[in-house]
A protein has these predicted regions:
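Ankyrin-repeat-protein effector appendages
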Residues: 140-149, 232, 251-293
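Alpha-helical transmembrane segments and their immediate juxtamembrane cytosolic regions
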Residues: 2-141, 216, 229, 289-577
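Ankyrin-repeat boundary/"N-cap" motif
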Residues: 139-149, 163, 172-183, 206-213, ...
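Ankyrin repeat structural motif
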Residues: 155-163, 189-197, 222-230, 256-262, ...
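TPR/TPR-like (Sel1-like) alpha-helical repeat modules
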Residues: 231-237
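Ankyrin repeat A-helix N-terminal signature
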Residues: 149-155, 183-189, 216-222, 249-257
C-alpha cells in the first residue's frame, strides 16, 4: 500500500533521491512553450502577430506540442508538489508555494504583462501605419467551386447549383470546420443565408467550439443574416464551449475580430461590425419571446463570465492554476489524514492498469475543451473545465510520488508508448480538423466527435509516459549543463513572450521561408534569455526568488539541495510545480 504524502502535519526528515530526469522533463515542457509561441505566427490559429505565410508543418508542430506540453508539465508539477509536501508539511508547503509561485506571478503582473501589452499596442500601431503583406490563403476551396467558398463569396447562383447537385448544407468545411450558413453570415450574404435555410440548413447546427451560425453572425455584426437566423429558430441561449451565447460573442473587440478574420482569410471592417452589432442588439431587444431564451441580462453572471474569460494573466496563467491546485492538494492531504486514509495500492499507479482509469477520465475532461488539446484560461477565475482537465494530471503526478516504486516503472516501455502516441495524435488531429476524414470506413461525424477526445486522451498519456521513460534513460545522471538549463527554464518562460511577439511583428515584413523565420526567432530569443539568466538572474535576488540561492563558480560553496532536483532535506529550488 502506498501512502499519501504528508499524512502528518509535521515535515518528514527522510531524504528523497534526486530526480534529474523528471526535473529536466519539466524544464523541457516549459521551454517547448517558447517554440510553440514562436510557431503560432505561421499556424492557422488566431494569434497576436500573424505572418503572411503559413506552414502546415509548423502548424502541426504547434498543435501537437500544445496537446501534450502542459499536461506533461502539470504531471511533473504534481509529483514535485507531493515531494515538497511530504518534506515541509502542509503549512511549509503553502508558504513555499506562495514564495516560489505566487510572488513571481505578482511581479510578472507588474513587469512582464505590461511589457506584453506595450508590444501588442506598439506592434498594432506600426502594422496599422504600414501593414505587412496579407496571408495568401482564404476560404477552403479546391480548383472547382464548393458550397463553402460559394457561400462565403455570396455567389448565390453557384450556391443554388451546388445544393441542387446534392452539396451538403449541414456539413462543415474540412479546413476550419465552419458551416455554409456561417460562411454566408460572415459577409452578411443574406440571400445565400435565406436560400440555405430554405434548403434545410439547420440554424442551430454546432461547429468547432460548439458555436452556431448565430454566434458567427453576431460576432461579425451581420445584422441581416442574424435576423434571418432568428426567424428560422436560431437559439439565442446556445452556449459554446467557452460558455458564450451569441449575445456574448458581440462583446469581443477589434483584436479578436481581426484575429478571426485573418484566420478565415476574410476582411472585416470593424466600424461596420460594430454598427451591425448595434442593429442586432436592437433586434434582439424587440423580440417578444426574449424572456424565453434563457438569456436574460444578469450583471452578476456577466461579471463572473468576464472574470473567467479575461486575459489578466496572459501566458502566466499556468502559475495561477498551480496556486489553485497546490491549495487543493493541501486540502486533500488534510482531509485524507483526518479520514486516516492509508493510500492506494501500487497496482493502480502502474501501467497499463492506471491507463484504464486515466484515459476515460481524461477523455471526459478533453470533451469539454474546444479543439485539439486543452483550452487556455487566463482570467482571474479559472474556467472549471480547464482547471479540472489539468487537475487530472496534477493529481496523478502526486499519486506517482506516493508510489515511487510503481511510478519508476511507468515509462519503461517508452519504445511502445511513443509510437502509440504518434499514431493516436495524428488520428486525433485529423479528426479535429476533418471530422469526415475517415468517412470511407463508415465513421460519420457524430461517431468521430465521440472518438476524438478518446484518441486525444490516449495520445497525451502515452506521450507523457513515453517521455518519462525516455528521460529516465537519457537524463538520470547528474549534468551541470542540464541543471543550468533546468534552472533557467522558469526565467525563460516568464520573460520570453514579449520578445517573441516583438520579433513576430518585425519578421512579418521579411520575405523569408517560415522555417527560417521560426528558427531565427526561437534561437535569438532563447539565446538572449539564457545570457540574461546567466548575467542578471541566476546569482541575483531574482534567481534566489525563482530558484533559491546558487553559488557563483569558484565560490567554494555547495548549493543547497532542492526538491525535485536533489535531496529534499534542504529545499531551495524554485518549484514551479
Amino acid at each position: 500500500m502506498t501512502h499519501f504524502p504528508s499524512q502528518n502535519s509535521t515535515p518528514s526528515p527522510a531524504p528523497t533521491a534526486r530526480r534529474h530526469d523528471l526535473d529536466a522533463l519539466r524544464a523541457f515542457a516549459m521551454l517547448l512553450g517558447i517554440g510553440l509561441h514562436a510557431g503560432l505566427a505561421y499556424a492557422p490559429i488566431p494569434w497576436i502577430a500573424m505572418n503572411r505565410e503559413t506552414s502546415p508543418a509548423l502548424g502541426a508542430f504547434v498543435e501537437i506540442t500544445h496537446g501534450f506540453r502542459l499536461p506533461l508539465f502539470f504531471l511533473m508539477s504534481g509529483f514535485f508538489s507531493a515531494m515538497l509536501l511530504q518534506r515541509r508539511g502542509i503549512r511549509g508547503f503553502l508558504r513555499h508555494r506562495a514564495k516560489r509561485i505566487g510572488l513571481p506571478l505578482l511581479l510578472g503582473m507588474v513587469t512582464v504583462i505590461p511589457a506584453m501589452w506595450a508590444v501588442i499596442i506598439g506592434g498594432n500601431i506600426v502594422v496599422g501605419v504600414t501593414p505587412p503583406p496579407q496571408r495568401e490563403w482564404s476560404v477552403p476551396a479546391d480548383d472547382a467551386p464548393n458550397i463553402w467558398s460559394a457561400a462565403a463569396s455570396g455567389d448565390l447562383p453557384t450556391v443554388q447549383r451546388l445544393v441542387q447537385s446534392g452539396a451538403p448544407v449541414n456539413e462543415p468545411d474540412p479546413r476550419v470546420y465552419t458551416l455554409p450558413l456561417a460562411w454566408a453570415s460572415i459577409g452578411d450574404n443574406a440571400e445565400a443565408v435565406a436560400f440555405l435555410l430554405e434548403s434545410g440548413a439547420d440554424p442551430n447546427r454546432r461547429m468547432g467550439d460548439d458555436n452556431t451560425p448565430l454566434h458567427t453572425a453576431c460576432f461579425f455584426g451581420a445584422a441581416d443574416s442574424a435576423a434571418l437566423l432568428l426567424d428560422a429558430g436560431a437559439d439565442l441561449g446556445a452556449r459554446n464551449k467557452g460558455g458564450e451565447t451569441p449575445i456574448d460573442s458581440m462583446r469581443h473587440g477589434r483584436g479578436a475580430v481581426d484575429f478571426i478574420a485573418n484566420l478565415l482569410g476574410v476582411t472585416a471592417d470593424y466600424e461596420k461590425v460594430e454598427a451591425g452589432r448595434r442593429e442586432i442588439a436592437r433586434l434582439i431587444e424587440s423580440l417578444p419571446a426574449r424572456s424565453e431564451t434563457g438569456d436574460q441580462p444578469s450583471p452578476v453572471r456577466d461579471a463572473i463570465a468576464g472574470l473567467v474569460r479575461g486575459e489578466l494573466f496572459m501566458h502566466l496563467w499556468f502559475l495561477w492554476h498551480l496556486c489553485w491546485l497546490a491549495c487543493a492538494l493541501a486540502l486533500a492531504t488534510a482531509l485524507l489524514r483526518t479520514l486516516r486514509f492509508r493510500g492506494v495500492p501500487p497496482l493502480l499507479i502502474s501501467t497499463p492498469v492506471c491507463l484504464f482509469a486515466l484515459i476515460p477520465l481524461t477523455a471526459i475532461t478533453q470533451s469539454w475543451q474546444s479543439g485539439f488539446g486543452p483550452d487556455t484560461s487566463a482570467g482571474l477565475i479559472p474556467a472549471p473545465r480547464v482547471l479540472a482537465h489539468y487537475a487530472v494530471f496534477f493529481g496523478f503526478g502526486a499519486l506517482m510520488f506516493t508510489g515511487r516504486d510503481a511510478a519508476d516503472r511507468l515509462g519503461r516501455a517508452w519504445w511502445v508508448h511513443l509510437p502509440i502516441a504518434a499514431l493516436a495524435g495524428a488520428c486525433a488531429l485529423r479528426l479535429t480538423h476533418e471530422p469526415l476524414a475517415f468517412a470511407e470506413t463508415g465513421l460519420n461525424a457524430s461517431t468521430a466527435a465521440r472518438l476524438e477526445p478518446i484518441l486525444q486522451a490516449v495520445f497525451v498519456w502515452t506521450a507523457s509516459l513515453g517521455l518519462m521513460g525516455l528521460a529516465r534513460v537519457l537524463l538520470s545522471a547528474p549534468s551541470e549543463r542540464v541543471r543550468f538549463v533546468s534552472d533557467s527554464s522558469y526565467w525563460l518562460y516568464i520573460a520570453h513572450l514579449p520578445l517573441i511577439v516583438a520579433g513576430q511583428f518585425a519578421l512579418a515584413y521579411l520575405d523569408l521561408p517560415p522555417f527560417a523565420e521560426f528558427a531565427l526567432l526561437t534561437g535569438v530569443v532563447t539565446g538572449l534569455l539564457l545570457l540574461s539568466y546567466r548575467a542578471f538572474v541566476r546569482y541575483t535576488w531574482i534567481g534566489r526568488l525563482l530558484n533559491g540561492p546558487r553559488p557563483r563558480p569558484g565560490a567554494g560553496l555547495q548549493p543547497r539541495e532542492a526538491p525535485g532536483l536533489a535531496r529534499v532535506s534542504t529545499p531551495t529550488r524554485a518549484e514551479t510545480g
